């Protein structure tokens, strides 16, 4: 089994180190007829169709009737400039160095980085007038998923598996572990997480579906009954491992979902679902005896949004809940700002913006205790309003 446990690269420079590049200027407006938006993907996504940001950018370009192109690898930003791109988006933090270098040298072209900041030649964070940032708070949903999983486990062991060791992936792994720690603190439990150490900021990553499957099988053998694969298209390996385990208690928290993978419930349907909840949970939940409570806030937060039936069927393994990170609105904003000649900005993808979602629990909803449901609802509301801030070493 080819495993690799690596330390994710953490940008530790403080916000005080941000400086403005004197030679940069805000690029002028670019009419849609002459604009060209482009995705610069890492070598981890040589096929742009497997990169969620590139896919979202292509869709936004189509909606705006603007030309689109993509390229992968460290040389992608420079080649896209030569190709006449007027907006170039680096799709993950591993592209930060090459995007930053190219942006500094081409002030008339707009750039954007997803989940990372621009840097100067020495690697210090820098603010560029032609550089926007997409600030991805996928960690918010991952934190909630960690808390929920801790309340649903029957073995007391959970696991996470990363794919590309970029900031967005690492932040989700860290936040999931934080959510578990929060549950332990609140309930006096000692539920553990395999695959991530939020003291050392090290985790277990995999390059292929086969590696994900091998890691998932290993974690299942160590007692993990809820596994979170954060490996993009390679998540399928975790589904295969769960299916092969043939253990009905082993479930997945699925990732890589967009809004196109969801279905919505009406308020009446959500309330009907709430009425049949048993108030029972897994052995580790520490929940009180079943009781009838007002779960409308929980319904508002989670029950209206579910993973679509056909998506669950395609996954082919039991899915407890899902983490949605949808970049569509953020890409629309980047294109609108570029064509209008607006100043560079920071574009949020978060619970509050609607770009980050923890889905409902489907058939597992009756197994959530009233205490767990209301706790999740309360935390989600606090996160959206800023009362609870989920921070990781990998934040922009």
Model-derived features with residue positions:
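A residue-level marker of the well-folded mature domains of exported/periplasmic proteins
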Residues: 24-396
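Bacterial N-terminal signal peptides that target proteins for export
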Residues: 1-10
């Amino acid at each position: 089994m080819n495993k690799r446990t690596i330390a994710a690269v953490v940008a530790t420079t403080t916000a005080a180190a941000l400086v403005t590049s004197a030679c940069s200027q805000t690029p002028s407006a670019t009419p849609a007829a002459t604009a060209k938006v482009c995705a610069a993907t890492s070598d981890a996504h040589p096929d742009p169709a497997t990169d969620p940001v590139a896919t979202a950018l292509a869709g936004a370009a189509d909606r705006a009737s603007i030309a689109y192109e993509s390229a992968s690898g460290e040389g992608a930003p420079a080649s896209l400039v030569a190709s006449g791109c007027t907006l170039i988006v680096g799709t993950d933090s591993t592209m930060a160095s090459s995007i930053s270098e190219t942006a500094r040298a081409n002030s008339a072209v707009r750039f954007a980085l997803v989940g990372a900041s621009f840097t100067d030649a020495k690697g210090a964070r820098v603010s560029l007038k032609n550089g926007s940032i997409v600030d991805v708070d996928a960690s918010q949903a991952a934190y909630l998923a960690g808390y929920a999983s801790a309340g649903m486990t029957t073995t007391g062991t959970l696991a996470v598996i990363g794919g590309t060791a970029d900031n967005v992936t690492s932040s989700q792994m860290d936040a999931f572990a934080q959510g578990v720690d929060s549950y332990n603190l609140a309930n006096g439990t000692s539920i553990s997480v395999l695959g991530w150490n939020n003291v050392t900021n090290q985790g277990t990553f995999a390059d292929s579906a086969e590696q994900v499957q091998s890691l998932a099988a290993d974690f299942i053998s160590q007692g993990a009954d809820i596994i979170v694969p954060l490996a993009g298209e390679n998540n399928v390996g975790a589904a295969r491992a769960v299916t092969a385990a043939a253990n009905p208690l082993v479930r997945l928290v699925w990732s890589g979902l967009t809004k196109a993978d969801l279905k919505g419930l009406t308020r009446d349907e959500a309330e009907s679902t709430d009425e049949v909840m048993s108030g029972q949970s897994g052995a580790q939940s520490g929940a009180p005896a079943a009781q009838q409570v007002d779960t409308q806030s929980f319904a508002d937060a989670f029950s209206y949004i579910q993973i679509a039936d056909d998506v669950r069927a395609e996954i082919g393994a039991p899915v407890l809940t899902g983490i949605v990170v949808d970049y569509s609105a953020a890409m629309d904003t980047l294109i609108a700002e570029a064509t209008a000649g607006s100043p560079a900005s920071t574009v949020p993808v978060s619970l509050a913006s609607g770009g980050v979602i923890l889905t409902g629990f489907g058939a597992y909803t009756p197994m959530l205790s009233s205490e767990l449901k209301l706790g999740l609802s309360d935390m989600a509301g606090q996160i959206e309003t800023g009362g609870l801030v989920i921070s990781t070493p990998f934040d922009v």
